[in-house]
C-alpha cells in the first residue's frame, strides 16, 4: 500500500514541476500497484 501512496505522491510532484516524463512513469507505477493490490484481494 505504501508503494501506491508513494507513486501518487510522485505523480503529484511531477505534475507540479511539469516533469512530464516523471509524470508518465508515476502513472504507470500507480496502475501497477493498483493492479497488485486488486490481485491480492481477489487471489490472483
Curated annotation (Swiss-Prot):
<dbReference type="InterPro" id="IPR008846">
    <property type="entry name" value="PSMbeta"/>
</dbReference>
<keyword id="KW-0291">Formylation</keyword>
<keyword id="KW-0204">Cytolysis</keyword>
<keyword id="KW-0044">Antibiotic</keyword>
<keyword id="KW-0964">Secreted</keyword>
<dbReference type="GO" id="GO:0090729">
    <property type="term" value="F:toxin activity"/>
</dbReference>
<comment type="similarity">
    <text>Belongs to the staphylococcal hemolytic protein family.</text>
</comment>
<dbReference type="GO" id="GO:0042742">
    <property type="term" value="P:defense response to bacterium"/>
</dbReference>
<dbReference type="GO" id="GO:0005576">
    <property type="term" value="C:extracellular region"/>
</dbReference>
<dbReference type="Pfam" id="PF05480">
    <property type="entry name" value="PSMbeta"/>
</dbReference>
<keyword id="KW-0800">Toxin</keyword>
<keyword id="KW-0929">Antimicrobial</keyword>
<feature type="modified residue" description="N-formylmethionine">
    <location>
        <position position="1"/>
    </location>
</feature>
<keyword id="KW-0354">Hemolysis</keyword>
<dbReference type="GO" id="GO:0031640">
    <property type="term" value="P:killing of cells of another organism"/>
</dbReference>
<protein>
    <recommendedName>
        <fullName>Antibacterial protein 3</fullName>
    </recommendedName>
</protein>
<keyword id="KW-0843">Virulence</keyword>
<comment type="function">
    <text>Has hemolytic activity and also inhibits the growth of gonococci.</text>
</comment>
